[in-house]
Design a protein with these regions (language model features):
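Conserved beta-loop-alpha segment that forms the PLP phosphate-binding cup at the N-terminus of a helix
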Residues: 1-9, 115
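Short, charged/polar "capping" segments at the starts of alpha-helices
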Residues: 15-22, 84-86
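Short, charged, surface-exposed secondary-structure boundary motifs
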Residues: 19-23, 39-41, 108-113
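Active-site phosphate-binding strand-loop segment of PLP-dependent enzymes
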Residues: 28-82
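A short alpha/beta connector and helix-capping loop motif
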Residues: 86-101
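Conserved core segment of the aminotransferase class I/II
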Residues: 98-155
Length: 156
């Protein structure tokens, strides 16, 4: 969020509540997509699958093409992807800056903060700095690795 703190954050109603809580707490500007059109100067967060219905969002490719055209950065939040089956999504849209994953929706490990963020570029933010100094929560990583080795994504 900090990289785009000067932008207006956007998300659909039904998006994962963590984002709205974070934006409110940090006093970031934000608005539901349903309440205004996407504009240059926005930053978009989308969950895949969509947390509001567990499935696809309508017109997602059209929205991402508009984001590319308007240079709107997009974070794809895949925290619910382990719960999805037969999911298909095109991550090739140039507007997509980050893709994040979490194990806390499939396993009871929320306090271990097991997840990862993928990025097209090294923009030297906090996570890249931590990684460059090899600061990693190895215990959480090991627990997460053991869980995904032992249990299929649809075990629960």
């Amino acid at each position: 969020y900090l990289k785009h703190k000067g932008k207006r954050f956007r998300a659909f109603q039904g998006e994962y509540a963590y984002h709205f809580i974070s934006w409110r707490y940090a006093k970031f500007r934000w608005k539901y997509i349903e309440d205004d059109v996407l504009r240059k100067g926005d930053a978009l967060v989308l969950s895949v699958p969509f947390s509001g219905n567990g499935g696809d969002l309508k017109n997602i490719d059209k929205i991402l093409k508009k984001c590319t055209r308007l240079k709107i950065p997009v974070l794809i939040d895949c925290c619910y992807s382990p719960l999805a089956t037969n999911m298909s999504f095109n991550f090739d849209h140039p507007c997509i800056e980050y893709v994040s994953f979490s194990l806390s929706k499939i396993f009871p490990v929320g306090h271990l903060r097991i997840g990862m963020r993928l990025s097209r570029t090294d923009d030297d933010d906090q996570l890249f700095v931590y990684k460059s100094f090899n600061y990693k929560n190895r215990l959480s990583m090991k627990i997460g690795l053991d869980l995904i080795k032992k249990f299929d994504h649809d075990y629960i």
